[in-house]
């Protein structure tokens, strides 16, 4: 149902139960869910079973009284055609044809905003994701973060939040020094395995590319920074460091552009030190008695806030442990007015959650417990040609986001080749690969491991889940083209006020009813996915919606001779196309109007 319909029906049920309960009774909220079997109706409610014990009555008897009261309520009679009691006290509901028609009209009227809440309904939210070290190409784990984080940010925006996307660069750790000496070694003509090659050095081919550009005195720039020109002096480690970091930030920017992800801000860890924020946070914790010294180190009393043991903040050599700048960084989020913050990170960061939260609580500046929220994801395994791919030649030790996009795109075209050729709209050349990677990485819950099958991503048939969904959209477009010609989109307005009885009446095909029911669930699905920080739910929904469409398409011919029936079915397809388009937009995947199709395997 539409949210307004749900509220109206819930109010009728609530009033019915309240009239049967003592005035001071604490009643649960009335909720509805889809029955497991379509034969049981459109919705089910278990309120009678929830409150029967407290009211000292039989659940079925209570359910009957609720049903009698709801049937007499005009708010419900406009929406419900039938109410039935099942099992120990479930109340099954069948919606009226008018209620079904109201859903289709709402989709057609709201268009690209169907399922969205009013802009500004909520406050500000900051979503931090990817946040890779600028020491190498983005790997598939970063790709999963990018897909999750961007889809989650879109979801929150659809729910009326003002969303700020942020990328935190860890550009102040020991890994940056390792990057610099790796490039320096390459610039000196060394390669992995040679005598004198640093043991901790990065081995990917990208290090040789950086070294070559550094020796050539080239200039590079990241999206938010000043250009950096290489000095070419292989003894100047600081110059190498600056050039290498900027070079890799630019490479990561290219990968994110190919992936269709944009950030509002890139926040540098190094700025927390140069601005004195790290030291200020530490001194504040000391002043508030949240630290102590032991074994030559400074410790934070994280056990005061639920951690299993206290943690070292400052080591004996005077350097800070890695969670300390994180505390300072999250303080800036709070000070910038973000009362809601969500971090999307790999599950290997689980151990830092309690430490960061304990540090924030220790500062005693009003930050609520449980701040920030976290979405943790597990690893991704890549399969290609039936075998696991563990190493990328470019990265040296892992598969990159760029690898996945190019492999899943089909053909021989590469991102580097497009850039070197000066192709202006090069990201559009990789739409197929981007769509596949984004959809695949959202097709499982974040907290489950995922196997990315490149061979499956390349298939152009129903075995490929992203193709299956996109083809539903393209097939609908082809039906409209057959109906309205090349300018069919301009004619969709004709369907806004058609008689919808042929797709909403009680005696129409179950496939038509199921498809309309799925369209009605879209707003509530988005709200739940946003609340639960679960963007995978959108991908799940889209696969179900595509399945319902294909079932309807196979059951009911659309372009029939009967004009009334034809227009009603076209209106149902127009609404389906709109919801497919909206859902794909939420997860950052395109909705093509034409698609090639290969034969399914025998």
Swiss-Prot record:
Keywords: Aminoacyl-tRNA synthetase, ATP-binding, Cytoplasm, Ligase, Nucleotide-binding, Protein biosynthesis
Cellular location(s): Cytoplasm
Similarity section: Belongs to the class-I aminoacyl-tRNA synthetase family.
GO MF annotation: an example: ATP binding
Catalysis performed (reactions): tRNA(Arg) + L-arginine + ATP = L-arginyl-tRNA(Arg) + AMP + diphosphate
UniProt xrefs under Gene3D superfamilies: Arginyl tRNA synthetase N-terminal domain (3.30.1360.70), HUPs (3.40.50.620), Isoleucyl-tRNA Synthetase, Domain 1 (1.10.730.10)
Transmembrane segments annotated in the record for this chain: none
Any one of the GO BP annotations: arginyl-tRNA aminoacylation
GO CC annotation: cytoplasm
Family annotation (HAMAP family): Arg_tRNA_synth
Matching SUPFAM superfamilies: Anticodon-binding domain of a subclass of class I aminoacyl-tRNA synthetases, Arginyl-tRNA synthetase (ArgRS), N-terminal 'additional' domain, Nucleotidylyl transferase
Record's subunit section: Monomer.
Gene source species: Cupriavidus metallidurans (strain ATCC 43123 / DSM 2839 / NBRC 102507 / CH34)
Name this polypeptide is given: Arginine--tRNA ligase
EC number: 6.1.1.19
InterPro entries noted in UniProt: aa-tRNA-synth_I_CS, Arg-tRNA-ligase, Arg-tRNA-synth_N, Arg-tRNA-synth_N_sf, ArgRS_core, DALR_anticod-bd, Rossmann-like_a/b/a_fold, tRNAsynth_Ia_anticodon-bd
SMART domains noted in UniProt: Arg_tRNA_synt_N, DALR_1
Classification lineage: Bacteria, Pseudomonadati, Pseudomonadota, Betaproteobacteria, Burkholderiales
Residue ranges annotated as motif 'HIGH' region: 132-142
